[in-house]
Each structure stands twice: as C-alpha cells, then as structure tokens.
Amino acid sequence: MGARTVEGKKGYTLSDIAKELGVNKATVSKAISGKGNLSAETRARILEFIDECGYRPNAVAQSLARCRTYNIGLMMPDQADVFDSAFFRDCLRGVCQVAGEHNYDVLMAMDNESVNENLSRLIDNRKIDGVIAMRSQVKSPVVTLLKQTQVPFVLIGTSSDQKILHIDNDNLRACRDLTRMLIAGGVRKMALLGGDENNCVTHIRLRGFREACEESGLNFQEQMIALNVTRKNQIGDVLQQAMARGVECIVCMDDYICNLVMAHLRTNGISVPQKVKVASFYDSVLLENNIPPVTSLRFDAGELGCRACRMLIDRLEGKQVLEPEIPPYQVIARESTK
C-alpha cells in the first residue's frame, strides 16, 4: 500500500477507502464534503466505513476538497439547429458518459453574445471545476475568458496556441481524401457549401478541399465556394447559382447543410446523382438513410467527447495529460455520387 497521509486505526488513505468500497476517489470526496449528487445509501455506506476505520482527512486535503464541485461546464453553440447536429449530440453523449464514470456532473451553458456573463457567473460562484468548449472559433470570447481566469479547460477543435489543451478530428486529411475520391471518379466542377466563417473547422475543411483540387490539377478558382450558408432560406439561391454554372457535384461541409440541400433538390425534381452528385464532409443517420444515401465522412464524435472529458479530468486530478490520440475516420462512398 502507498504512503500514509492520514492518521487512523489502519492509516487509511482516500484511495484505500475507494478501493475497499469499490468506488472512485471522487465519490468518497463527495461523501466527506457533503457535496455532489450521491444517493443517500452510497453516502451512508462510505461514512459508516470511514467511521469504522478511523479515517481523519488531512486538513489541507480537506480544504482543497471543499473547493471542488465535481461539476464540468460544457459550452455549447447557441444556435437553433445545435441539437439537430449529429456532431454535437454525439459529442455531448461522450462527455456525459466519461463524466458520469468519474462521478462528475455536467452543467451546460450556451455560447452566445451573453457568454461572458454566463460563464463568468459559473466561475465566480465556483459552480464548476473546469470547462469543455465544444467549438473552436477564429475569435472566441470563451477561450479568451478561460485563459484570463485560468480555469482548466479543454477545447474540442483546433488551436494554434500549444498551451491550450485541445483535441480534434483530422478534418484536413479527411476532407482532402473525400475530395480526391470525387475527382478520381471524374468530377471536375464542384460547389462547396460551408457554414460560419468564424468557426475554425470551416477553414480547415476549405483547405482540405483546396489541396485536393490543386494536387489533382484542377483550377481551384473555377470551383464555386459558398460560405456562411447558415439558414434554410439561403439554400435555394445558392443551388440555383450552382446549377446555372454546370456544377457536377455539390459538396456540403456538414450534415445539416446537406440535409437542406437534399430536401431542396428533391422538392424541385432535381434527381441525385443523375443530374447532380452530392457529398458531405460529415455523416449522420439521416444521410445514411436518405434516398439516395449520401457519400460522407464518418467520424466518431462520441469518442472525441470521451477523450476530451478524460483529458480535462486528468488535468483536474493532477495527472499527466498525454498527447491525445486522434479518433479515426472513414470515407463512405454511397449512391449519391455514383
């Protein structure tokens, strides 16, 4: 057994108690501090064992434990379609799964124009131990505030600041691979439809598309690029321009845009892939089950959320945070590009 840090009949440590009872250290800490979401039965069992073994918490450790909330703040984009997005739904599931396994709770806050006020309130009132930011932006008030307040956080997305803990899918290579496949299949004129330019992933996907075009000898300037396509009422005008230019394939940066594109084409009697091919840089169940099913990139956003949460908990518990392993992806060719 390890070094004794407390006095008692057997010199039990917090880790020893957790091991004896088959729970983790966070659960024992919650029982001692009286904070956190524990059942009355679990709390009573832990406190009874502590009384029997004569455990007395170290004063410094107890003081630190009182400051812990075992709450993780999760910053979600404040947009109407956020829960329609397969990425955010699956990522949220992964975060909550790992948080629950370690006896942490998740408090969700929306990343909107009031984000500084909302996040500052959580920080100032000591409601959270750390934060997971669910998107990386070119200009991010969330990251700026977290750096200023020195609250531990993990960013899901890319960052040029090597001091920031972050993890992301390999969007650059994946988008390049899918675009290469389209070009290898004979596509020469494409329209790329993307979302908010303030999101870093938009620029990464554009770069992957551009690199595939250039290395294949296609003139990137001849491809149609439409960014900031964030509303349903924009789709019709963009697709009208694309069809007028003789575009052979419409490439959508995410599943939300792609669902809107497929619905518009279907409503207007434009057959896929006979009149125009369609592909997406992000897959979802809706695209897989569409008629026809859509060629897409499949990422494991659930695993991304799991790994981000493990990184944050390791940081909060003083463990070494290792370089994260990037989850794999798949290029899935379906009927929409045949």
Where are these regions (language model features)?
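Short, solvent-exposed amphipathic alpha-helices that sit
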Residues: 86-101, 174-178, 200-219, 260, ...
